[in-house]
C-alpha cells in the first residue's frame, strides 16, 4: 500500500522549483482566480520555515506590507504556484525563523551570502 502511495505522489511532484532554504528571499508568483479571470499575483518575502516532505511539503514566506507583517503558507507542489524566483540567499543558523516576528526594522535584516 505504501509503495502505491509513493508511486502516485511521485508523479505529482514538481521538478521546476529552485533550491531554497529558510532565510532566502523569494518572489512567489501565485495564480489567483477572480470571477472568470485568472491573474498572477506576486508575493515577495523571506522564507521563515519549510516543513513536511514529499507531496505535502509546505513553506511559509513573511513580508512587511504597509507596516503590517504578513505571512503566507504555500504547498510546495501546488499548481497554483506559477513560478518561484530566489531573489537573494540569506545566511541563518536556524531552520525555523519565528524570531523574525518580534524584530522590527534593521534588526530583522538577514545577512546575505553569495552563491
UniProtKB/Swiss-Prot annotation:
GO cellular component terms listed in the entry, alphabetical order: cytosolic large ribosomal subunit
What are the recorded GO MF terms, alphabetically?
A: structural constituent of ribosome
Q: Which Pfam families match?
A: Ribosomal_L19
Domain of life, per lineage:
Bacteria
Enumerate the UniProt keywords alphabetically.
Answer: Ribonucleoprotein, Ribosomal protein
Keyword Ribonucleoprotein listed? yes
Gene Ontology biological process: translation
Query: What InterPro entries does the record tag this protein with?
Result: Ribosomal_bL19, Ribosomal_bL19_CS, Ribosomal_bL19_sf, Translation_prot_SH3-like_sf
Briefly, what is this protein's role?
Answer: This protein is located at the 30S-50S ribosomal subunit interface and may play a role in the structure and function of the aminoacyl-tRNA binding site.
Please report which protein family the annotation says this sequence is part of: Belongs to the bacterial ribosomal protein bL19 family.
HAMAP family xref list: Ribosomal_bL19 (MF_00402)
Q: What is this protein called?
A: Large ribosomal subunit protein bL19
Instruction: Give the originating organism.
Output: Bacillus licheniformis (strain ATCC 14580 / DSM 13 / JCM 2505 / CCUG 7422 / NBRC 12200 / NCIMB 9375 / NCTC 10341 / NRRL NRS-1264 / Gibson 46)
- Gene name, per UniProt, is rplS
Amino acid at each position: 500500500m505504501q509503495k502505491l502511495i509513493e508511486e502516485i505522489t511521485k508523479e505529482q511532484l514538481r521538478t521546476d522549483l529552485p533550491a531554497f532554504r529558510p532565510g532566502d528571499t523569494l518572489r512567489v508568483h501565485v495564480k489567483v482566480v477572480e470571477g472568470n479571470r485568472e491573474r498572477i499575483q506576486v508575493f515577495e518575502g523571506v522564507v521563515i520555515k519549510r516543513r513536511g516532505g514529499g507531496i505535502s511539503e509546505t513553506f511559509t514566506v513573511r513580508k512587511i506590507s504597509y507596516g503590517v507583517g504578513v505571512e503566507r503558507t504555500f504547498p510546495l507542489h501546488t499548481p497554483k504556484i506559477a513560478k518561484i524566483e530566489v531573489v537573494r540567499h540569506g545566511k541563518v543558523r536556524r531552520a525555523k525563523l519565528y524570531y523574525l516576528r518580534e524584530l522590527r526594522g534593521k534588526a530583522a535584516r538577514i545577512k546575505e551570502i553569495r552563491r
